[in-house]
């Protein structure tokens, strides 16, 4: 089993450098595969870095800080970290300048950002679900700094999980067993028995509540981006986590198991890159007659306007627009 850093490029990448006198046809085919993959990955990462960088800038300097935007800001930082570290690894594979320290830190922070994104998306889903089920509590009794405290705790949890995964499994040429297996039992429990079920269940409740309460109106934009972001994460980012757990937990040395890792990593970078696009597209909906700037679109999608309505002398809160 090879370290993760050496498997984040198609298998042809390492085969070519190890063969000193490869056949010309084979050499050409391997290099085409290698540089095509790296080029596409770098383009995706570059676009994602620009998009998340703009999103971070707008959220810090241009958009009023709200509970939900705090989560989105931290999620953008996590996505930016994943994209930056993935770019570094691809550049190392391109120029064959293998610095073990640089690559080790790049892999560490990439996994760190990935885990943080998973944790933050779960927190976002759960909180918005609570805001639908208990609107009065959310608007009146929610702790003022709950988002900041939650993000801090989730970053700390990601430090613990990522540190254990990297120390015992990912950065080792021969992962330390049974320690590595215990680490991935812990990671697997957190991921598939805690965070993913909470994420899916919260979004299912959110979807049902939005559809039932807003008929025949369209769903609130805020909830659309939450559900879209979660679906994209489950489709594009989760497969890499599943492969890592299967590979390291089973101590697999089968090359076929790791052959798909580079492409799953590419899907993960697509997930990190597409989130700002989702925010802008959803924020621009229903604006057919006027063009809205990026700032205006983001302000529209992140705004939360509790509307007070009276029915039988009771105060009810409508969903944010």
From Swiss-Prot:
GO biological processes: G protein-coupled receptor signaling pathway
A cellular component annotation (GO) from this entry: plasma membrane
Subcellular location per the Swiss-Prot or TrEMBL entry: Cell membrane
Transmembrane segments: 36-56, 72-92, 103-126, 148-168, 189-209, 226-246, 248-271
Domain of life per record: Eukaryota
SUPFAM superfamilies per UniProt: Family A G protein-coupled receptor-like
Chief site of localization: membrane
Stretches assigned to the Extracellular side: 1-35, 93-102, 169-188, 247
Membrane topology, as annotated: Multi-pass membrane protein
GO MF term list: angiotensin receptor activity; G protein-coupled receptor activity
Pfam families: 7tm_1
Glycosylation sites: 23
Cytoplasmic side of membrane: 57-71, 127-147, 210-225, 272-320
Keyword annotations of the record: Cell membrane, G-protein coupled receptor, Glycoprotein, Membrane, Receptor, Transducer, Transmembrane, Transmembrane helix
PANTHER family, per database record: MAS-RELATED G-PROTEIN COUPLED RECEPTOR (PTHR11334), MAS-RELATED G-PROTEIN COUPLED RECEPTOR MEMBER H (PTHR11334:SF60)
Family: Belongs to the G-protein coupled receptor 1 family. Mas subfamily.
Function summary: Orphan receptor. May regulate nociceptor function and/or development, including the sensation or modulation of pain.
Name this polypeptide is given: Mas-related G-protein coupled receptor member H
Organism in which the protein naturally occurs: Rattus norvegicus (Rat)
């Amino acid at each position: 089993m090879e370290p993760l850093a050496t498997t984040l490029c198609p298998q042809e990448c390492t085969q070519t450098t190890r063969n000193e006198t490869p056949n010309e046809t084979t050499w050409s085919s391997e290099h085409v595969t290698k540089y095509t993959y790296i080029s596409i990955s770098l383009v995706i990462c570059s676009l994602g870095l620009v998009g998340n960088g703009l999103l971070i800038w707008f959220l810090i300097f241009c958009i009023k800080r709200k509970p939900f935007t705090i989560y989105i800001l931290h999620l953008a930082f996590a996505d930016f970290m994943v994209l930056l570290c993935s770019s570094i690894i691809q550049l190392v594979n391109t120029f064959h300048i293998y610095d073990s320290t640089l690559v080790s830190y790049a892999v560490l922070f990439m996994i760190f950002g990935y885990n943080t994104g998973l944790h933050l998306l779960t927190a976002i889903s759960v909180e918005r679900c609570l805001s639908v089920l208990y609107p009065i509590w959310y608007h009146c009794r929610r702790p003022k700094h709950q988002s900041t405290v939650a993000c801090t705790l989730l970053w700390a949890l990601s430090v613990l999980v990522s540190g254990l995964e990297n120390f015992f499994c990912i950065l080792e040429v021969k992962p330390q067993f049974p320690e590595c297996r215990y680490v991935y039992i812990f990671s697997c429990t957190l991921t598939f028995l805690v965070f993913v079920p909470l994420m899916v269940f919260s979004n299912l409740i959110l979807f049902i509540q939005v559809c039932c309460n807003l008929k025949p109106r369209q769903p609130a934009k805020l909830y659309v981006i939450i559900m879209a972001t979660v679906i994209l994460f489950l489709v594009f980012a989760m497969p890499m986590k599943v492969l890592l757990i299967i590979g390291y937990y089973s101590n697999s040395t089968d090359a076929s198991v790791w052959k798909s890792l580079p492409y799953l990593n590419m899907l993960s970078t697509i997930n990190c890159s597409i989130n700002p696009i989702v925010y802008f597209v959803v924020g621009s909906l229903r604006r057919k007659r006027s063009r809205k700037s990026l700032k205006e679109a983001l302000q529209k999608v992140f705004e939360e306007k509790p509307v007070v309505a009276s029915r039988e002398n009771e105060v009810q809160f409508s969903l944010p627009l």
